[in-house]
Amino acid sequence: SVVGIDLGFLNCYIAVARSGGIETIANEYSDRCTPACISLGSRSQIVTNVRNTIHGFKKIRLPYELQKMPNGSTGVKVRLKVLATTFDPYLGGRVEPPLKSVMDQANLQREDINSIEIVGGATRIPAVKEQVTRFFLKDISTTLNADEAVARNHPAPFSKSIDLPIQSSLYRNAVEEYVYDFRDKFITPEDMNKYGQPIQMKYVEHEERPK
């Protein structure tokens, strides 16, 4: 004899094939339909008997590993081996769209920009620097470290200086001071995802630094 089971979400059908033909198994719950949700000690299904109901048993054995997502849903865990030579161009390709967006928001052209300074971990990726250089048609600078960026209140990895820093020496109380006139415009994260990564960028203009 051969037993065949047709598993549905709430119901299933069990049939036995013998030499005389195929017989669909009947049961006490219904004539020939067997619930896919099994309630222990009760005929009620999952809607009215959640505590004692076993459901989804047909999905216990899976050819992949499930992963709980931050929003509470269930995802599939995937492992992928990618060479840096393949991944870097893909990552670099995601740099240009936000740059275009903020340039449009600021109503600026490439020729309006004198210097480009980028900070952050992504500046170590050659493909990212190459994409930024190609977009602005200018060499970029990475001399500004993260601590200095925080001290200058840089809110995002990509910053744009309209004018180069102007250094002038002033003698005040016999002490030489260096005054930098920075007029900066920034690309700032307008919204962040659960991982702290920007999902939408916004162009803002900051006030001039006090002298």
From Swiss-Prot:
GO terms for molecular function: ATP binding; ATP-dependent protein folding chaperone. Its main location: cytoplasm. One of its GO terms (cellular component) is cytosol. Gene3D superfamilies: 3.30.420.40. It comes from the Eukaryota. The modification Phosphoserine is found at residue 161. Homodimer. This is Heat shock 70 kDa protein 4L.
